[in-house]
């Protein structure tokens, strides 16, 4: 009988305790794998999109390093057809956490990244469908990006991501700036 009474008291006291326990998140040396994707320069055309994969590593002050790769496709209209511009880029960046809620469920970060990669226009084909010659050339590109990212922990190991990013890339034949709006998922692996 004493055993049941002790068990009932323990359950009631735990249920009524005002303290809450939260998961361990944003700890140093935690690593995560991100899968991301979204639209480029708004969602005017579903043909303008990006997708990528990245690895995140957290630091002592709840900031993180990000290393990854992205594929971006943007189509330009030309006389009733579209001319594709594809970018293959590698990223290395650092994100600063500047806002989080008390339950450590939502985190808002701002980050800067260095980008380098390759741009191809119309997949290297210079002749267009109407006989015109495309002057844009394939090229190596370099530049950077500024990102605002919201992380929402679904579980201790699964995180939903939402971000807005402005990229600037030099070396290519077409526009330097592109804005990205995207979503992603991150899996914490340790």
PLM-predicted stretches and their roles:
Residues 1-28, 190:
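Cleavable N-terminal export/targeting peptides
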Residues 3, 25-29, 61-63, 100-106, ...:
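Short coil turns and loop connectors of transmembrane beta-barrels in diderm outer membranes
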Residues 21-74, 186-190:
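Short glycine/proline- and aromatic-enriched beta-strand/turn motifs that initiate or cap beta-hairpins
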Residues 29-31, 45-51, 82-90, 106, ...:
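Residues that define the transmembrane beta-barrel architecture of outer-membrane proteins
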Residues 34-36, 48-50, 56, 64-66, ...:
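Residue-level detection of beta-strand scaffold positions
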Residues 38-41, 76-83, 130-136, 168-172:
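Extracellular loop and loop/strand-boundary signature of outer-membrane beta-barrel proteins
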Residues 54-129, 187-190:
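Gram-negative (and chloroplast) outer-membrane scaffold detector with strong preference
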Residues 72-74, 146-190:
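Predominantly the C-terminal beta-signal and adjacent terminal strand-loop region
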